[in-house]
């Protein structure tokens, strides 16, 4: 029997006849980072809310560490929302102490825990700084610290890197990995940053129209759409995009051609070798290529292949 920390069994959520989540069954293993991907309105947020007890399903149930979710202990789950939930008039240390008191963390455990979080998330020098004076990156790291001050077994991160600079993002990623690798926590991650999902997730669920359409490792998901590289180009006249797609689709060894956010993605075998013929088709249409790159398959390519839409659409 698989050792699941969270198991969703046939979860369905309906709103006045609209099915937001449709018969979803997912098992999240202990000690893994589990990523959720889906376009806006796909049902991923509703799914997660049901899986952590914030929303009652229309039907189905959720088992957390062998117990019905209605019977789990207070503090089993830590939530780090995308919106910053901070006390602007308190210092970092005061904020962490207050949250620890809310969870009734004993003082002999609280004090070293607060200091460790300040150290691990590079906030020690700002421990006595009022939150309103922190940078955006520091506030987001404090937001995470508040979510885990009580040592939850499960941590839910909703767009944790939103708006962060690369340095702050790297600090956050390293801490997320440490929660899994050192502390053995189960982490549920939602993100629009494809590199983040790829780098951090052990497995990823792709949700669309309230249904689970794929669940696998990032590597296996990228293998699933097959061989070939992707030529990503932007034309001087976006109105010609569909004309170029029609020109290229019959070509040999071109696997797929799609328009994504005003650009054309061409997945092909020996993509670099195909560039001269592609350029001939562009010239035939009387337009020029403003920007072009050749890359390997990404998770976003997987998503587009499976759903026919971009992640932010």
State the predicted function of each range:
Residues 151:
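Conserved catalytic motifs of ABC-family nucleotide-binding domains
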Residues 174-269:
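ABC transporter nucleotide-binding domain
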Residues 155-158:
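Catalytic Walker B motif of ABC-type/P-loop ATPase nucleotide-binding domains
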Residues 97, 101, 108-126:
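Conserved ABC ATPase "signature" region
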Residues 52:
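Helix-to-loop junction immediately C-terminal to a conserved catalytic motif
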Residues 130-134:
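Conserved ABC ATPase signature
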Residues 60-75:
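Conserved ABC transporter NBD signature motif
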